[in-house]
Amino acid sequence: MAVPLLLLTKDLLFITKVKEVALATGRQVVTVKSDKGLEETLVGCAEPGLLMVDLEKAVFPFEQLASRIQGLIGERWQCVSFFSHVHADLEDRAKTLGLGDVMPRSRFVKVLPDLLRSL
């Protein structure tokens, strides 16, 4: 069974870009559009997966996200968070909150194919 891939963003263009990369690697991405949807999806996944969080355009503030997902994902899920390079202040805040590997959006796009192939 393929590892679940969840993307938290409201950015429709970026959703399309991530889904294209995923399809090119034979994967499918689920876009989560609400905090309730996130909890239901995480609880409903029998397999651990990859949670990709847009720190600027997530469906709710990432500070709130961090507190909600810690108990749901634990060590089972890998989390990658990304931000625009013009908002570099988000990096330290996200790392402090434990939102996984945190990187600029441009780097995320660059490493995404290899990341998906490694799962």
What are these regions (language model features)?
Residues 76-85:
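A short, hydrophobic beta-strand element within the central beta-sheet of small alpha/beta folds
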Residues 3-12:
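Conserved acidic segment of CheY-like receiver
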Residues 34-50:
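Acidic, metal-coordinating helix/loop segments flanking the phosphotransfer/catalytic sites
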Residues 52-69:
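Conserved phosphotransfer microenvironments
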Residues 86-100:
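Alpha4 helix (beta4-alpha4-beta5 surface) of REC/receiver domains from two-component response regulators
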Residues 98-110:
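Output/docking surface of receiver
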Residues 112-119:
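A charged, well-structured terminal subsegment
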Residues 27-34:
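Short hydrophobic/Thr-rich beta-strand motif most characteristic of the beta2 strand and flanking loop
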